[in-house]
Amino acid sequence: DNPDVPGCHIYMEAQIFSPDSKRMVLHRSAHPHGSDPLDPEHQYFLCDFENDGTLTDLTDECGVTAPSLSPDGNVFYYFLDELSSKGRVVLKKPDLKTGKCEERGVIESDGTFAPAYFFYPLSTISSDGKRIAIATGLRKKDSQEWPEHGLWVIDVETGEYRLILHGEEFCNLHLQYCRAKEEPHAILIQHNHGSRLLYKTEGAKSGIGKGHVAALDPDSDFALRKIRKSDDPNADNTGFGLDLHIISDDGSGWKTLPVGRDGIEFCQGHQCWRGESTRVIASTLLFDTPLTATQELVEMESFPGNVHCRNNSAGGKRNILSRKVIPAHFLHFATDRSGSRIVSDYESDDGEWHLYTGKLGAMGDAADLHFTLNLGSREKSPWHPHPFLSPDGRKAFFNSSASGQLQAYCLELE
């Protein structure tokens, strides 16, 4: 309704589609990685594909974030970020028919920690629709020190909540409930070893400290480095980087995925469940030289325990899906609900954004990936495309600012 306000899709791992592929949630005055919590223009809308893409307002207040659509597509949830004003976050549930909104719960403190300063812009809902998980920064109760990051789980009916995970290195959790009905408690998480991202306070002022690790260690800057554990504090081999785990939503039952942080292969920080299965796909980074690298798509099965090794993990199975595409430069991706189709963006050596689509076979098979669309140069469209598929796999969605304005796009595949 305002051509001067940018719009885009919500991050590709978000649960924002109805299972029949007829409706989805998107937002305006946002960018592909989130939004400004103080921007009143940032709002969520419901897009109805059966009604020519008509948009219906879902929110009308400042501070909306972390949306989720229930697995049956009938209930929409979002959170209100009141961290800076009241030190809390509020779970809300608007009626999709009447628009009337009700408060379902408030997260303030678990007795030791309270949410603070940073709200991860995505939530994730369990496959039985009973619980939602979010991630925030943490501060100790009645203290101005904000030393850690945490994963909260809230019951959508009772409003009861628990802090199930916390630590300095959980700054970018990419939390994702498994969508398999038989695994309603399993959550995929990301552990950024070496990351701190501390927020420091000086009186009433606060600021972001240095030390965030997205995928590599803080000093890498795409330099070729060996990443491994070392007992020598002066060693260059730090053990920094990220790896992936699956945990239960009570904080127990750790499992590990056989990928990354072995000195050769790094996780990029983009991963998702393969449809409604219990397998996970992640994008990796392997340096050929200090300035050149390939980015593969790897499918994995987890194994029990909280350990960190790649190919020597007993019981851990993996398959390089993108091995038939040379060179591989896959970054952000998603599958359909059945886990039989995939879409990914691809940054070519000449700086062009490409869109690839394809089919997935049995565990062990290479993906049938093929070039589908040129999305333009990264110079003209620097924002990440973050593509994903409708649950039925018939539509692909991506972001682009090639026109001069960031917008959300849809591509009919069949």
Where do the model's predicted regions map?
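Asp-box/WD-like beta-propeller blade repeats and closely related beta-sheet repeat scaffolds
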Residues: D57-D142, W146-H149, L163-F170
